[in-house]
Amino acid sequence: MASLLYLILFLLFVCISYYFTYYPTNKLQAAVMETDRENAIIRQRNDEIPTRTLDTAIFTDASTVASAQIHLYYNSNIGKIIMSLNGKKHTFNLYDDNDIRTLLPILLLSK
């Protein structure tokens, strides 16, 4: 009978140890785990949108149109699109209206 009690207490100890090892036991751990989960989702979204190479038309002047090949990268964490054109890097902020007005014709005229 005593050995059965020891076995039950040992299994209870193993279950409690497992709980404290693998589950958050305070608010800080719970917050960190939640933040890590959100960051993993954002990282996965960014990986799903690959760096793209687009053939597009660039308006160098009001009357001049040049065909160019651009490389685009979208980062949803900071809300920016990074465009590489002829070795120059241009960054567009998606929360700025002027940047959106500049970027929209480039994306609409690309294939």
Curated annotation (Swiss-Prot):
Keywords: Fusion of virus membrane with host cell membrane, Fusion of virus membrane with host membrane, Late protein, Membrane, Signal-anchor, Transmembrane, Transmembrane helix, Viral envelope protein, Viral penetration into host cytoplasm, Virion, Virus entry into host cell
Family label: Belongs to the orthopoxvirus OPG086 family.
Subunit structure: Interacts with OPG099/L5. Component of the entry fusion complex (EFC) composed of OPG053/F9, OPG076/O3, OPG086/G3, OPG094/G9, OPG095/L1, OPG099/L5, OPG107/H2, OPG143/A16, OPG104/J5, OPG147/A21 and OPG155/A28. Except for OPG095/L1 and OPG053/F9, each of the EFC proteins is required for assembly or stability of the complex.
Protein name: Entry-fusion complex protein OPG086
Signal peptide location: none
Up-regulation conditions: Expressed in the late phase of the viral replicative cycle.
Virion surface side: 22-111
Stored InterPro entries: Poxvirus_G3
Function description: Component of the entry fusion complex (EFC), which consists of 11 proteins. During cell infection, this complex mediates entry of the virion core into the host cytoplasm by a two-step mechanism consisting of lipid mixing of the viral and cellular membranes and subsequent pore formation.
Membrane topology: Single-pass membrane protein
Location, primary (coarse class): virion
Subcellular location: Virion membrane
Record bears the keyword tRNA processing: no
A GO cellular component entry from the record: membrane
TM stretches of this protein: 1-21
PTM field: Unglycosylated because produced in viral factories instead of the classic ER -Golgi route.
Pfam family, one: Chordopox_G3
Lineage top rank: taxon: Viruses
One GO term (biological process): fusion of virus membrane with host plasma membrane
